[in-house]
């Protein structure tokens, strides 16, 4: 019509039309993607977009289109999708590609303590239909390319956030085939894919010429943080300088909220999702509690998070005031106790250059001084079944801490979202099983793997999760606590410890000398 005429006469213009002019270059927007006043149009015509620059038609880029379906009201739109919902997993994988990692990516590994894979809406729908899944949407914007869900599988295997995409399954399989053909000889590759004209990065890992996993590198902006994917634990990286893509990018916190309050809030939010033991009269030790403000913000957050009746002991080398039950002002090396703890948190920071940093005055004597003490404290004073979170950075770390982490039922490196633009992470060990002689990956290699993860991933900084405090409190799990002799520590006992169902340590009253008073609980 008239719009078409004036478009053809203009040098620079964009035409959006329901007419398809085959002789000109265009992009097609399927009608099912169209939204009017927040309502998606159930039946409408496809739209065609044409663009002219300097009097000539421009070839517009190709993109994959999301389908805009939610997993609750999912309807298949192709034979491939119907096959996926009707066929057995074995038959579907056999028919459409054994080497595409479909078991992980489409079907999801539901039998692990942390749900693996499951990166498509149709995959979620399949599990939902079989009553194998509960999910709660956490982003409700229809303009997001990715949808984010809290996912809970019926056997308790869970994932904090599942980031899924709703592409037509035909398009998704073709995308996987193209990735495999182009990059299959690599070990890993970040592949940028245009979806709804947004550039989405897919992290892809290959093994023996097949895709092992392929997931969108997009965790929602309100996540409490990022934990290192399992695959980075088994790499064999060489130590390189930390070169974080968004290093030093600031974050605006609400007025009156200290960085450490936000950071500890996110650390606690993450620990709440693990199998950390929470007994009655829990005992928590917090190292490096002080701050340059003379207060202990981390202890305040911990006290708010921990159940009623928990004993919180904190310590720092610099003077500070604290909400903890017991505060010890001293060099950590001087702090000794016979008692064992259920959770140990450390925010101590040092590095091998600490003398120079402190103008010749030794606030602490470097990594060996601080972290060898901390390692020996964990070995001697962490209850079996207990957990720990120790702050490390590129230069403030020690290989012995990675050894202890590998003696836990599970471990990871966790970066809080508020501080994701620094090299800081908490080394988290969940459910300590005691010193073992099992073969471990060297701490140097693991630290290099951590740096490698940080160097090749952009972690979005965000403070959103600190507003999500309705369910902040750590749930009292009433984990049983027993004091066992060595010969009583059977396989059954270790299985209970491994699952976070038992703590082994001294029981009864504790006595601590605080800098202000003697405290017996």
UniProtKB/Swiss-Prot annotation:
Which keywords appear in this protein's UniProt record, sorted alphabetically? Endonuclease, Hydrolase, Methyltransferase, Nuclease, Transferase
Which part of the chain is the AV-Nsp11N/CoV-Nsp15M domain?
1-58
The residue ranges of the Nidovirus-type SAM-dependent 2'-O-MTase domain are 219-518
Which spans are transmembrane here? Answer: none
General function of this protein: The replicase polyprotein of coronaviruses is a multifunctional protein: it contains the activities necessary for the transcription of negative stranded RNA, leader RNA, subgenomic mRNAs and progeny virion RNA as well as proteinases responsible for the cleavage of the polyprotein into functional products.
Instruction: List the catalytic residues.
Output: 104, 119, 159, 263, 347, 391, 424
**GO MF annotations for this entry?**
endonuclease activity; mRNA (nucleoside-2'-O-)-methyltransferase activity; RNA nuclease activity
- The signal peptide stretch is none
Identify the taxonomic lineage of the organism of origin: Viruses, Riboviria, Orthornavirae, Pisuviricota, Pisoniviricetes
Which protein is depicted? Replicase polyprotein 1ab
Q: Could you say which residues are annotated as the site Cleavage?
A: 219-220
């Amino acid at each position: 019509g008239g719009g078409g005429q004036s478009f053809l006469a203009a040098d620079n213009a964009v035409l959006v039309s329901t007419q398809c002019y085959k002789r000109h270059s265009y992009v097609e927007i399927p009608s099912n993607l169209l939204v009017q006043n927040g309502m998606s149009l159930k039946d409408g015509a496809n739209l065609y977009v044409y663009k002219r620059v300097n009097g000539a038609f421009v070839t517009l880029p190709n993109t994959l289109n999301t389908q805009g379906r939610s997993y609750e009201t999912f309807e298949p739109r192709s034979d491939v999708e119907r096959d996926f919902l009707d066929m057995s997993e074995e038959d579907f994988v056999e028919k459409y590609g054994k080497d595409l990692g479909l078991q992980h990516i489409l079907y999801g590994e539901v039998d692990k303590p942390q749900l693996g894979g499951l990166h498509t809406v149709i995959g979620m729908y399949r599990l939902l239909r079989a009553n194998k899944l509960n999910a709660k949407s956490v982003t409700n914007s229809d303009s997001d390319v990715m949808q984010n869900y809290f996912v809970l599988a019926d056997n308790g295997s869970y994932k904090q956030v599942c980031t899924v995409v709703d592409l037509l399954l035909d398009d998704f399989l073709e995308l996987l085939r193209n990735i495999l053909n182009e990059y299959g000889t690599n070990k890993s590759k970040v592949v940028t894919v245009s979806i709804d004209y947004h550039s989405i990065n897919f992290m892809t890992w290959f093994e023996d010429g097949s895709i092992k996993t392929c997931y969108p590198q997009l965790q929602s902006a309100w996540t409490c943080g990022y934990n290192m994917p399992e695959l980075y634990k088994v790499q064999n990286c060489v130590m390189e300088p930390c070169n974080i893509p968004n290093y030093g990018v600031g974050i605006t916190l609400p007025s009156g909220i200290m960085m450490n309050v936000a950071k500890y809030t996110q650390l606690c939010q993450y620990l709440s999702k693990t199998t950390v033991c929470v007994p009655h009269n829990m005992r928590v030790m917090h190292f490096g509690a002080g701050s340059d403000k003379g207060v202990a913000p981390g202890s305040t957050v911990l006290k708010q998070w921990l159940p009623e009746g928990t004993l919180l002991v904190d310590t720092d080398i610099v003077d500070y005031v604290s909400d903890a039950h017991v505060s010890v002002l001293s060099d950590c090396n001087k702090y000794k106790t016979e008692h064992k703890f259920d959770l140990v948190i450390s925010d101590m920071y040092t590095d091998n250059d600490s003398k120079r940093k402190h103008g010749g005055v030794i606030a602490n004597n470097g990594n060996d001084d601080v972290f060898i003490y901390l390692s020996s404290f964990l070995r001697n004073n962490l209850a079996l079944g207990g957990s720990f979170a120790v702050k490390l950075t590129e230069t403030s770390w020690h290989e012995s801490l990675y050894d202890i982490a590998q003696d836990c039922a599970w471990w990871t490196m966790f970066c809080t979202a508020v501080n994701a633009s620094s090299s800081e992470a908490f080394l988290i060990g969940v459910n300590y099983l005691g010193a073992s002689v099992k073969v471990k990956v060297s701490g140097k290699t693991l630290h290099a793997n951590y740096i490698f993860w940080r160097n090749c991933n952009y972690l979005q900084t965000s403070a959103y999760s600190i507003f999500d405090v309705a369910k902040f409190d750590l749930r009292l799990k009433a984990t049983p606590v027993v004091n066992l002799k060595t010969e009583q520590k059977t396989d059954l006992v270790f299985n209970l410890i491994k699952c976070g169902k038992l703590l082994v340590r001294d029981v009864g009253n504790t006595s601590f000398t605080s800098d202000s008073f003697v405290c017996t609980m």
